[in-house]
Amino acid sequence: MLDDGTLKVEGFKSTDEGVAFWCSVDGLEIYHAGDLNHWYWDGEDPQWNKNMAKAYQEEISKMHGRTADIAFLPLDPRLGEYFYLGIDDFVKEVDAKRIFPMHFWGEYDVAERLKKMPCSAGYCDRIVEIHEEGESWEI
């Protein structure tokens, strides 16, 4: 953890490569998952998928009860029908005011697909739909 009095950065172990970051700055709480996700690959060994789910849950449980003003979370269509698991698990542990999907490989409709799923009923209004590369928002 880095805390210089203005910026506080906490790192979390990834379930793939790199790390995830929780940044606190100027009264804002910003979470960037990087590759920390519930990776469930169809065709992968069932025990591997089970271990991945456990590892993801262990990391996000460290953030239990916190509120992120902005959360950047993987929503990867390569996972097929399981593309939404990471976001769905995350919002059960952490309140996120705005969710920015990432890792969607140019499939811009993936957020819209999640928003139509019954599991997202409690948070679909917080998912930001991204329509093109380079799009920007003011929060």
Regions found by a protein language model. Give the residues of each.
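Noncatalytic linker/hinge segments flanking ATPase motor cores
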Residues: 15, 36, 72-77, 111-119, ...
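Conserved protein kinase catalytic core
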Residues: 41, 80, 109
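A short, acidic, amphipathic alpha-helical segment used as a generic capping/interface helix at domain edges
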Residues: 56-61, 80-89
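Short beta->alpha connector loops
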Residues: 13-18, 77-80, 105-106
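Active-site neighborhood of phospho(di)ester-bond hydrolases with catalytic His/Asp-centered motifs
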Residues: 31-34, 51, 70-76, 98-105, ...
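Binuclear metal-ion centers of metallo-dependent hydrolases, dominated by the metallo-beta-lactamase
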Residues: 1, 83-139
